[in-house]
Design a protein with these regions (language model features):
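Acidic catalytic cores of enzymes that act on phosphate-bearing nucleotides/polynucleotides
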Residues: 214-217
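Non-catalytic, usually N-terminal nucleic-acid engagement modules in DNA/RNA processing proteins
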Residues: 1-208
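Short, flexible hinge/linker loops that cap or flank conserved catalytic cores
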Residues: 210-212
Length: 225
């Protein structure tokens, strides 16, 4: 079963604690979700994660799509079994990685860009490897240059095959140097993509009804605005 239970609220209503119930265990919120990008948390074993109090692990749909492939992870029993982690798992949609790697972002990212220039954020001397349109994102693999295309439907298909308890809707990543007009355009595109993700998620959930239920979470966008 899957669900969310509120356990307490602040008097002003601006904060709460709760419990997310998943097929692989409960998550007390607010929670730090450990990042295991390629279905592996660097330098820590699953047992060590448990000893440290980790409640859940997040893997990356984009990276697992490229290597070793979501079909292989599916055949292994899903991302949890693939990484020998028996607790709750999350996957993100791949949108951030597709677009950030495509633009060649540096590590300099901040909400206050008054003292920054585009050169501080966008890596120099790199061709843009990702192009966005209303249908999705076309990009080249940084591994071998192969051309791929992610759409909301493709992201949902990959994440269903990865089998995490919680999946993320496919969204468009923008930079703090995009104009407000473009941010609004991208936000509306992300909203439409979320609707497409939900429709495909429902279709795949019915098609794979024998599998444990996977939840779909939305992504809040809007950049600095």
């Amino acid at each position: 079963t899957f669900g969310f239970q509120v356990t307490s609220r602040l008097d002003n209503g601006l904060g709460r604690t709760g419990i997310i119930h998943t097929p692989h265990g409960d998550i007390e919120t607010p929670a730090f979700i450990v990042v295991g990008t390629k279905a592996s948390v660097k330098a820590l074993t699953p047992d060590q994660l448990t000893d440290l109090g980790a409640q859940a692990v997040l893997a990356n749909a984009y990276h697992l799509f490229l290597q070793p492939g979501h079909d292989l992870v599916d055949e292994a029993g899903g991302v949890g079994q693939f990484m020998a982690w028996d607790g709750p798992t999350f996957t993100d949609s791949g949108g951030f990685q597709v677009l950030s790697l495509g633009a060649g972002f540096k590590k300099t990212l901040a909400m206050d860009v008054s003292q920054l220039t585009e050169a501080d954020v966008i890596a120099a001397d790199r061709d843009r490897k990702a192009m966005v349109d209303d249908g999705g994102v076309t990009f080249r693999s940084p591994l071998n240059g192969d051309l791929h295309r992610f759409t909301p439907e493709v992201s949902m298909s990959i994440q269903h095959r990865l089998g995490a308890d919680v999946m993320m809707a496919f969204d468009e990543l923008t930079t703090l140097f995009n104009t407000r007009a473009y941010q609004e355009e991208a936000l509306e595109r992300t909203r439409r993509w979320a609707e497409r993700c939900l429709a495909e998620h429902r279709r795949l959930s019915a098609e794979r009804a024998e599998r444990p239920y996977q939840a779909l979470y939305g992504v809040i966008q809007g950049a600095q605005y």
